[in-house]
């Protein structure tokens, strides 16, 4: 399964995520990294220094997804600003009320 607009592919299946009891909010393109991280956390009694490598890889994946979304939103905002600017310039060519109307 591939999400439109994302450079990453879904690797973990719905069945794998369901079996690993991954929360619905965490079922994104990095879920395949969260499954071994949660297994490590449970095996090591959630000691923060035990699963550093798995956590680092998972958090880097999440960071890359956030940055990808931010760049996409920035591009959308730039396109909207350009469209708005073009619309304003198009209206300026044909004034509806002459500037001398205030006299």
From Swiss-Prot:
Pfam families: NDUF_B7 (PF05676). Complex I is composed of at least 49 different subunits. Contains two C-X9-C motifs that are predicted to form a helix-coil-helix structure, permitting the formation of intramolecular disulfide bonds. GO terms for cellular component: mitochondrial inner membrane; mitochondrial intermembrane space; mitochondrial membrane; mitochondrion; respiratory chain complex I. Accessory subunit of the mitochondrial membrane respiratory chain NADH dehydrogenase (Complex I), that is believed not to be involved in catalysis. Complex I functions in the transfer of electrons from NADH to the respiratory chain. The immediate electron acceptor for the enzyme is believed to be ubiquinone. Signal peptide: none annotated. It is a peripheral membrane protein. It is found in: Mitochondrion; Mitochondrion inner membrane; Mitochondrion intermembrane space. It comes from the Eukaryota. The lineage of its organism: Eukaryota, Viridiplantae, Streptophyta, Embryophyta, Tracheophyta. A motif (Cx9C motif 2) lies at residues 51-61. One of its GO terms (biological process) is photorespiration. A motif (Cx9C motif 1) lies at residues 30-40. It comes from Arabidopsis thaliana (Mouse-ear cress). Disulfide bonds join 30-61, 40-51. Keywords: Disulfide bond, Electron transport, Membrane, Mitochondrion, Mitochondrion inner membrane, Repeat, Respiratory chain, Transport. This is NADH dehydrogenase [ubiquinone] 1 beta subcomplex subunit 7. Belongs to the complex I NDUFB7 subunit family. The keyword Signal does not apply.
